[in-house]
Amino acid sequence: MAGKLGVLLLALVLSLAQPASARRKLLVFLLDGFRADYISDEALESLPGFKEIVSRGVKVDYLTPDFPTLSYPNYYSLMTGRHCEVHQMTGNYMWDPDTNKSFDLGINRDSRLPLWWNGSEPLWVTLTKAKRKVYMYYWPGCEVEILGVRPTYCLEYKSVPTDINFVNAVSGALDVFKSGQADLAAIYYERVDVEGHHYGPSSPQRKDAVKAVDTVMAYMTKWIQERDLQDDLNVIIFSDHGMTDISWTDKVIKLDNYINLRDLQQLKGRGPVVSLWPAPGKHSEIYNKVRRVEHMTVYAKEDIPSRFYYKKGKFVSPLTLVADEGWFITENRESLPFWMNSTVTRKPEGWQWGWHGYDNELRAMRGIFLAFGPDFKSDFRAAPIRVVDIYNLMCKVTGVTPLPNNGSWSRVMCMLKDPASSAPGAPPCACALVTVLLVLLAILA
C-alpha cells in the first residue's frame, strides 16, 4: 500500500514541477514614441497591418510609462520589470558626482560603462545566461556588456534605422527563428518618434511613419505563415512613451533668466525634465529662485512624489525641474534643439514641435501594447497596464523564471489563452505543496 501511495505522490510531484506552459520563441518590437491613440479604433481603419494583429491577438487600452517619460528609463523598465529608481537608469542624460562620469543619450563612450547598466538584469541577459540565443536589432544597449554578458547577436544602433533597415531586421529575425538560431529576437524602430519630435504628433509626417510600420506589420504576419512559425512564435509590440505638442513661441522657460548658470555644478537634460546640481553653498539660493518660475514644478530630491518611483535613484539630482505639459525648459535660447535638414549643407532648419518626458499619468504620454501568437487570446481587449508589467509576460512565454520586479501579474494574465496557469516560475502554493509531498515520500521510503 505504501509503495502504491508513494508512486502516486511521486507522479503528483512531477506534474506540479512541470512548467505551466511550453517554451516558445518570442519576437519583440519596441516602437519608440508610438502614442496610444495612433492605433485608436478609428485610426485602425486605415492601418490594415495593425488591424489584423488586433483581430488575431491582444490590445490594451493603453500603456502607462515610467517617470520620466523618456526613452532610456523606459527601455530598461520594459526589459527588467523594475521602476527607474530600482534599475537606476533614471534619465536620457545622467551624471555621477562620485566619478564625474556622464551618460549622454547613450552616444558618449562613458555611456557604456557598467556604472549605468548593472543596476538590474534585463531579460536578454537572463536568457543569454540560460544558454538561450538572443538576436537584437538596433536595440539601445545591446552593444553593452551588462553583468558580464552580451547577447548572441547585436546589430548596433548607430543612427536612426531606415525603413529598409527595419524590413531587413524583421525578415532576418524570422529567418533565424526558422533556422533554430534564435529563441528571442528584439527589434527597435525609431522613425515614429523622430517624426513626432520634428513635426509634431498630429503631423502628416508622423502619420506616414505609422503607415510605414503598418506596412511592415502586414508583411510580417504573412512571413510568419510562410515560414510555418505561427504555432511556435509569439509576437509582442510595445512603445516606451507617447508624445505631445510643444510651442516655441510662448512656452519656453529659459533658466538663465532666473539663475546664474555658473552657480550650477552640473545641469543635465532639457525639455520636460531638467536635473540641477547646485554648486556647494548654492542649493538654497537656486531652489528659492527656480521654485517661483511659472509653468514648472521644482522638487528637492526628498520631495519628489513617491508615485513617480524616481527619487530613490542613485543618479537623481538634488533638484529636479518638471515642466507643465507642452512647456520646454532650457538653459538659454541658444540651447533650443534645432533639427538638421537632409541637404548637404546640414543647416538648422527649425525647432522641434513634439516632445515627451512629462508626468507619466498624462494622456499624451501613454504608449501601446499588442501581442499575438499561440499563447495569446484572439480579438481580446485588455484594461490599461503599466510598463513594468510586460516583463513578467515575456518571462512567461519564454519559459524563464523572472527576477524580483515591480510588475503586476494580475494585470496581464488575462491576455493568455490559459489564464488559470501560474505566474512565471512556480507559484508559492505549488512550491509549498511540492515540499509537503516530498516530506511524505521521505516518510514512506
From Swiss-Prot:
UniProt lists the gene as: ENPP6
Species whose genome carries this gene: Bos taurus
**Family the entry assigns:** Belongs to the nucleotide pyrophosphatase/phosphodiesterase family.
Cofactor(s) in the UniProt record: Zn(2+)
Q: How does it sit in the membrane?
A: Lipid-anchor; GPI-anchor
As for what it does, the entry says: Choline-specific glycerophosphodiesterase that hydrolyzes glycerophosphocholine (GPC) and lysophosphatidylcholine (LPC) and contributes to supplying choline to the cells. Has a preference for LPC with short (12:0 and 14:0) or polyunsaturated (18:2 and 20:4) fatty acids. In vitro, hydrolyzes only choline-containing lysophospholipids, such as sphingosylphosphorylcholine (SPC), platelet-activating factor (PAF) and lysoPAF, but not other lysophospholipids.
Q: Which catalytic residues are annotated?
A: 71
Q: Which residues bind substrate?
A: 32, 71, 92, 193, 241, 356
This one is known as Glycerophosphocholine choline phosphodiesterase ENPP6
